Each structure stands twice: as C-alpha cells, then as structure tokens.
Swiss-Prot record:
Entry's Gene Ontology cellular component terms: nucleus
Reaction it catalyzes: S-ubiquitinyl-[E2 ubiquitin-conjugating enzyme]-L-cysteine + [acceptor protein]-L-lysine = [E2 ubiquitin-conjugating enzyme]-L-cysteine + N(6)-ubiquitinyl-[acceptor protein]-L-lysine
Gene: ppp1r11
Annotated stretches, region: Disordered: 1-42, 96-119
Keywords: Protein phosphatase inhibitor, Transferase, Ubl conjugation pathway
Bias (Basic and acidic residues): 107-119
Class in the EC hierarchy, top level: transferase
The protein's name in its UniProt record: E3 ubiquitin-protein ligase PPP1R11
Length: 119
C-alpha cells in the first residue's frame, strides 16, 4: 500500500492517493460432462416376407393363428403334451406339417433333422 500527499498551490488542501495491491488467485473450475448413448426407438418392423394371416392388412410374426387348448384348472401350460411350433391346419400358407419320427425331409421343407423350425 502506498500513500502520497502534498500541498496544493491555491487552496491549501491536500489530496491523497491510496493504492492497494492484493494477490488474486484465478478460480479453477472444472466441468464434467457425462455423455450417454441415445436409446433407440423401440418399434416392430416387418420384412416383406412376413405373413398377413388374417387378411386384415396387418402383419404378424407367426404363420398361424395362436390357439390354446382349454385345460383343467390347475394344469400348467408346461404339462401340455401338444407343444408344437406350428399348426397342421389347411390355412397354414407356408405348408408346415407336423414332423413325424422317421419321415423323410424334402429340400423345400422348413424343418431341420431334429424337427424344429427354421426361419
């Protein structure tokens, strides 16, 4: 700190100047950004070979209508003996048939040798 004073020529008054020096430390601020991957919109998209099995202009991922056989109260769905991947009805436009043991497969068949579906 410095102070100066001195007489003036006309009025006899004095003036003073005060100088203050202070050390200012720069502020160190840090900013952290957390980037997150944008979640994709959840939507169903059908390919051109998806079947419209009800002829209503809608598409479905299954080739046949889903029918659940009525079962007695208390019987779980895992106890059912008819756990087929497709139906045998005439309206199945992909021609799926129930695989029988010992039957020969044709090259155009959708089944592999274990009898499971391939799509």
């Amino acid at each position: 700190m410095a102070e100066t004073s001195g007489p003036t020529a006309a009025g006899g008054s004095t003036s003073s100047t005060v100088t203050t020096e202070s050390e200012t430390q720069p502020e160190h601020r840090s900013l952290t950004l957390k980037l997150r991957k944008r979640k994709p919109d959840k939507k169903v998209e059908w390919t051109c070979d998806t079947v419209d099995n009800e002829n209503l202009g809608r598409r479905s991922s299954k080739c046949c209508c889903i029918y659940e056989k009525p079962r007695p109260f208390g019987e779980s769905s895992s106890e059912s003996e008819d756990d087929d991947d497709c139906c045998e009805s005439a309206h199945c436009i992909r021609g799926h048939k129930k695989a029988t043991s010992g039957s020969k497969e044709t090259p155009s068949s959708h089944h592999d040798k274990t009898g499971s579906m391939q799509h």
